[in-house]
């Protein structure tokens, strides 16, 4: 569930290895989808009109360029054409961390290719990621860092996942998402992620 301005919103997130994804939620009795990607187009439900709307071609292209990053850009990173550089050690909430710079496939912003870098902070004792950072390339906070904090790691089918994620900027408290359950390899219909069409 998401904590949004003191209101708890139940959500379901589906993420597939081939890049398809969708976040479904119910807000004040209305069902909607956000951050959906069907393998070709990014789309979301407009909060005001309750209609599904496709994102611009640039956003969809950038999502296509990131296919293969799940569950982690570091997994087989060289095969993806990414590079990883060990930076100077850092500290996250009092925990000594290794800091990695991951350079990924460039993004397209306003028609131009720009560097796509993400920084990872790994606990030096447990080797679990505690934080990631990447530069925001558009919008009112362009140039600032988007920060994701990971905590409450729990084991699911022999692997550890963070059940608490906070998405924030350097100047904000951020958005907390707390997961109740994680199910691996659920059965999902092929058209589950598709942009809805009018009947």
Residue ranges and their predicted role:
Residues 1-2, 9-10, 21-23, 29-31, ...:
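Intrinsically disordered, low-complexity segments enriched in polar/charged residues with Gly/Pro
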Residues 28, 93-195:
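Gly/Pro-enriched, hydrophobic low-complexity segments
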Residues 2, 7-11, 48-52, 62-68, ...:
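Generic detector of short, locally flexible boundary/turn motifs and exposed helical patches
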Residues 1-49, 83-88:
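N-terminal mature ectodomain segment of secretory-pathway/periplasmic proteins
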């Amino acid at each position: 569930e998401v904590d949004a301005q003191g209101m708890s919103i139940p959500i379901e997130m589906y993420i597939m290895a081939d890049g398809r994804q969708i976040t479904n939620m119910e807000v004040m009795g209305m069902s909607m989808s956000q951050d959906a990607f069907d393998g070709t187009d990014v789309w979301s439900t407009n909060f005001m009109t309750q209609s599904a709307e496709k994102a611009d071609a640039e956003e969809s292209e950038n999502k296509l360029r990131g296919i293969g990053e799940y569950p982690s850009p570091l997994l087989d990173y060289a095969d993806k054409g990414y590079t990883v550089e060990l930076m100077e050690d850092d500290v996250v909430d009092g925990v000594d961390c290794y800091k990695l710079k991951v350079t990924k496939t460039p993004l397209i912003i306003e028609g131009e290719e720009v560097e796509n870098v993400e920084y990872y902070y790994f606990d030096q004792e447990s080797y679990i990621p505690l934080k990631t950072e990447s530069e925001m390339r558009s919008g009112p906070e362009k140039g600032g860092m988007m920060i994701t904090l990971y905590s409450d790691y729990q084991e699911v089918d022999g692997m550890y996942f963070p059940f608490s994620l906070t998405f924030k900027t350097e100047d904000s408290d951020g958005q907390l998402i707390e997961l109740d359950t994680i199910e691996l390899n659920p059965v999902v219909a092929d058209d589950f992620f598709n942009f809805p069409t009018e009947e």
